[in-house]
Amino acid sequence: MAKIIKLDDHLSNKIAAGEVVERPASVVKELVENALDANSRKITIEVEAGGLDRIRVIDDGDGIEREDVETAFFRHATSKIKTDKDLFQIATLGFRGEALPSIASVSHVQIKTSTGGDGGTEMVLEGGVIKKIGSTAMGKGTDLTVTQLFYNTPARLKYVKTVHTELGNISDVVNRLALAHPYVSFQLFHNGKNVLRTSGNGDQLQVIAAIYGRTVAKQMVPLSGETIDFTVSGFAAKPEVTRASRQYMSLLVNGRYIRNVALSKAIQQGFHTLLPIGRYPIAIVNIELDPQLIDVNVHPSKLEVRVSKEEELCRLVTETIERAFKKEQLIPEATKPTGGKQKSEQLSFTLDDFTSAKPSEDRGSTSSNEENEQRSSIDKNVLFQEERKLSNDLPSINMVREASASVEPALEKEPPAAELTAGAKGAMEQASMEEETSNSLPANRVPTMYPIGQMHGTYILAQNDQGLYIIDQHAAQERMKYEYFREKVGEVTNELQELIVPITVECTLQEAAYIEEHLEDLKQVGLFFEEFGPQTFMIRQHPTWFPKGLEEETIREMIDQLMEKRKVDIKKLREEVAILMSCKAAIKANRHLRHDEMYALLEALRKSSDPFTCPHGRPIIVQITTYEMEKMFKRVM
């Protein structure tokens, strides 16, 4: 008797369902993707009990012909590809022909569909077995309902999470699809309650507002970049808006949401030193490319893909984000609201909200969050009108300018303390050089600020006609020192420094294996490792550009890079070394500065290429606008 047999289709579908249908969110994803492939312009998703009791997807797409309805639930039956050639230029979200039979094999399914001709077709399946098929009256489109999910696979049902968790996963899937397809109107209901609604007018920013709230949408910066092979667009939130996890970064390739570690790192690299350690950005990155450059046939879920010329694409994503932020003024307001989205405003959100606001809206608000939101930096034109009305009651800013101007001659006669002068002077020279060589950087990203004092020997207080500024002096000079050392360390030569006392480095077994494997690569960058006992190496010489006193830290950074990327990136290494040097060299807290020292530091900061955060991503400047100050003292209501 033969031991090897061919599994029947029913069992094969249940096995395939283990990969395709992991949880209720997987069902929603597959059904909505089918609706999108059918050219739908309106998709409604209804779920009950987190999708465990019922999932219903209704669309106004092309529908399915009567003779194809039964075939659609056969394994590997599809209308989206026909030949081998089609597999290498896939333009649809689905193509494997596994979703419908896999879903049907572990649930009860009812489908009603019509192509808009003579009525429609209705079919009912239980565990993949057809129980009923016939005609029904309906308009063009498809209405598919899934109930009793995993009823015949108790092992899978046992690992399903709580209703709230499953609803969160479903919401995440629909959010990503809505972001990827702004021209499609999405509605998501849970237990009859509307959770998400998008207009389908093609405006991705409105979709962002519906998902993340208007406050976040107002902080979005548009992205735009392209090469011969790739086009990048989308939005990234300003660095003051961050999250504790990576899940708020959405990568959308040809309308498909994907996960890609290299591209996610490219997004983070675009923010570079603008993000605090342990925080992640909100970003929606749309990537358009030739379908031949991407392989989506990696996993049945189609979330993992392989991209040709991935390194070039990562570089484009990083440069696009960097370029977008170079044009922005990134000083956060001290009173900026941080609340979540306001559902009452989702449906009426328009782009006009980003450029204007009526004073009557502010007076009519009963919510402090709404009031703060409407008085945010988006509405500066309205606020400045009220500021001018009260200008006669406040000390003239000209007095401050005159007082500050009198300090300028002192700067020429009496240089600041040596510790500050070297960093400030070097940074100012570097910033000046960058301004001459790069016309793309907008002028006056940081306004002129006039120091009026210091708080606790740590924070510089400055003002101008726009309000009060609080500057972290350590973070400010750390930024200056970083830019100075980045250029200094950037002068890499092939010269080596012989050491009188060799450096010994102890490694783990894994690190030692990587070092031995890449000895030649390390020699190329001027680092010669000699074995010196078990898991220990000795270094007798190193490149002359290694910073004095930080040789061991630099070598350790090289080893860490080798472990992560299997190569040594000199450019990245220089940046890490510059950050380390700048942190050690910058002035510390409780250091009292003279007026001319504060002024010199603020002027150097204005000319910095990235004046808003220190190299670790912490903010340097916080602003309290004149209006907010007047509001605190009840001068305006």
UniProtKB/Swiss-Prot annotation:
Which region ranges are annotated with the description Disordered? 352-384, 405-430
Top-level taxon of the source organism: Bacteria
Q: Which GO terms describe its cellular component?
A: mismatch repair complex
The UniProt keywords, alphabetically, are:
DNA damage, DNA repair
One function term, GO molecular function aspect? ATP hydrolysis activity
Q: Name one GO biological process term.
A: mismatch repair
- Pfam families to which the protein is assigned, alphabetical: DNA_mis_repair (PF01119), HATPase_c_3 (PF13589), MutL_C (PF08676)
Q: Which Gene3D superfamilies match?
A: 3.30.230.10, Histidine kinase-like ATPase, C-terminal domain, MutL, C-terminal domain, dimerisation subdomain, MutL, C-terminal domain, regulatory subdomain
Q: Does the keyword DNA repair apply?
A: yes
Similarity section: Belongs to the DNA mismatch repair MutL/HexB family.
Please explain the role this protein plays, according to its UniProt record.
This protein is involved in the repair of mismatches in DNA. It is required for dam-dependent methyl-directed DNA mismatch repair. May act as a 'molecular matchmaker', a protein that promotes the formation of a stable complex between two or more DNA-binding proteins in an ATP-dependent manner without itself being part of a final effector complex.
Q: What is this protein called?
A: DNA mismatch repair protein MutL
Provide the organism lineage as a comma list: Bacteria, Bacillati, Bacillota, Bacilli, Bacillales
